[in-house]
């Protein structure tokens, strides 16, 4: 791991996520659940359509839905996946969920689904001792920075940032990735 030595910290005491004010009985209600193998194709489509995420193979999304279902979440409207968070627990830090990707269908953006998925995932994992979230974000991805900073603020907890990967760490052209830690 390479580090520029820069560490930025914002402090908020940890608390559970805010309750949703959107009724769950509306026809377009967003429901959250663990992904299933059958969701893998749809997750791949959502990721592909973002035009921003590093697209993994369709196999990777199907496998993720099988092997990391308990640390991931799918948002559905009328039983159709419209968003997802893929994550895993770090073996060397079992109290930490590492969020790999967050994506929401274009027609569902602006409804705070991404933030609500992250809150739902953290709330689901808290009884198992997960009290930290990590993710990597490229320095120019202001939307993701705002998303994760907002989640930390909503949960009244800290968020830190430090360089994790430089462009030289990748075999192809790839931006630097900063590590953000919530909790």
Q: Can you describe what each PLM-predicted range is?
A:
Residues 101-109, 137-138:
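A short, internal acetyl-CoA/4′-phosphopantetheine-binding micro-motif in the GNAT/acyltransferase core
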Residues 115, 139-161:
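Conserved active-site alpha-helix within GNAT-family acetyltransferase domains
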Residues 1-18:
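N-terminal amphipathic/basic-hydrophobic helices that include classical n-h-c signal peptides
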Residues 104, 110-124, 146, 150:
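Conserved acetyl-CoA-binding loop-helix of GNAT-fold acetyltransferases
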Residues 38, 45-96, 100, 105, ...:
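Acetyl-CoA-dependent GNAT
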Residues 29-43:
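A short beta-loop-alpha structural element at the N-terminal edge
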Residues 155-183:
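C-terminal "cap" of GNAT-fold acetyltransferases
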Residues 125-139:
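Conserved GNAT acetyl-CoA-binding A-motif
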């Amino acid at each position: 791991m390479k580090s520029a030595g820069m560490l930025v910290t914002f402090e908020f005491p940890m608390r559970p996520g805010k309750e949703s004010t959107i009724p769950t009985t509306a026809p377009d209600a967003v429901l959250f659940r663990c992904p299933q193998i059958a969701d893998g194709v749809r997750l791949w489509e959502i990721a592909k359509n973002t035009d921003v995420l590093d697209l993994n193979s369709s196999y990777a999304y199907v496998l993720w839905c099988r092997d990391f279902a308990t640390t991931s979440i799918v948002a559905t409207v009328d039983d159709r996946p419209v968003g997802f968070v893929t994550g895993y627990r770090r073996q060397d830090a079992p109290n930490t969920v590492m969020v790999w990707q967050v994506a929401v269908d274009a027609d569902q953006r602006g409804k705070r689904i991404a933030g609500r998925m992250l809150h739902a995932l953290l709330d689901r994992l808290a009884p198992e001792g997960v009290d930290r979230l990590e993710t990597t974000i490229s320095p120019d991805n202001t939307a993701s920075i705002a998303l994760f900073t907002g989640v930390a603020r909503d949960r009244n907890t800290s968020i830190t940032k430090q360089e994790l990967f430089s462009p030289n760490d990748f075999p192809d052209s790839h931006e630097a990735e900063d590590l953000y830690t919530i909790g």
